[in-house]
């Protein structure tokens, strides 16, 4: 990475936890509903919302539960790099 490329990457990086939280609310789903499907407690869900990045396996599970391809966000960043 050059410094300029790194700066572009950082500006474009998303806070995946916030995006997941917004999608959950958009679907009008509760944190309890989400926690049950993730097989964790609500505290863990709130911890996910605070995370800027997530393990890919967890992100895949979340994508399946919410029927939303969160990986597309990263693909778009990759495809739009200069």
Language model: regions and residue ranges:
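Residue-level signal for the short linker/turn that defines the boundary of a DNA-recognition helix
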Residues: 3, 29, 54-57
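Short basic helix-loop element that most often maps to the first helix and adjoining turn
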Residues: 17-37
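Recognition helix of helix-turn-helix/homeodomain-like DNA-binding domains
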Residues: 39-54
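DNA major-groove recognition helix of helix-turn-helix/homeodomain DNA-binding modules
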Residues: 57-73
